[in-house]
Amino acid sequence: MATRNIGIVIDGATGRLGTTQHLRSLMTIRSEGGLLLASGDRLIPEPVLMGRDPAKLAVLAAANGDLKWSTDRDACLADPAIAIYFDANATGGRPVRAGAAVAAGKHVYLEKPIAETLEDALDLARRAERAGVKSGVVQDKLFLPGLTKLRKLYDTDFFGRILSVRLDFGWWVFDGTPYPAQRPSWNYRKATGGGLVLDMFAHWRYIFDRLLGEIKSVSCRHMTAPPECRRRVPAASDRRWCSAACIGCGPNWSPRSSF
């Protein structure tokens, strides 16, 4: 059986997502001998690290067996040895970056959300389809052990008719007090294309779609939890205070059990 290498450029390789999730996963696949295909061949990923900071890229590349790295996106997209462009960079500008990769004939795999608007997301998907390249978006939560077990139980009708579902989904994001912030500001700042709704709803949407069924409608209220929110203006600092707490209550008339 043949062994084939496939070049994958990771845009945003030194960020938290690029390093701790995606690069680590690719290196694990490499150490296991690559991905076994249905034909019996093995596909070996060859990561190429891309970012803005040469020093960080060099350190990360050395720590992973002297991988190739670059700060030149155009050069990477022009490299015939690279077949896949993966974007783990800031959400803002992702359609432009991915669109350039599609135009260069690269398959694209993107962190979610793939765009800030539905129109931009659909346009990107259609451009990839017209170009004849593969396009994909992260849906890693589907493969978590707990959710795969949930799906098995659902398929066997273990739950019977499901009347209501509650999902608590998230993790701690520190603001620098008292613990250091561990998420880049573009991930949560609306001004830079971020936000909890845009970032997190994309996760649970594919979970429900793939595990339980199609979503017919969504109702959402978004609020900022930190009590003090500042917005700088040329003359002064504008302070806004939010004193209300957010309370989640889910009443229903479906019995928990039969008595």
Where are the regions that the model predicts?
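N-terminal Rossmann-like dinucleotide-binding module
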Residues: 1-64
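Short active-site oxyanion
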Residues: 44-48, 83-85, 195
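Beta-loop-alpha module in the N-terminal Rossmann-like domain of NAD(P)-dependent dehydrogenases
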Residues: 55, 63-127
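Short loop/edge segments at beta-strand edges and connector loops
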Residues: 71, 110, 139, 220-222
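Predominantly a Rossmann-like dinucleotide-binding segment in NAD(P)-dependent oxidoreductases
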Residues: 141-243, 250-253
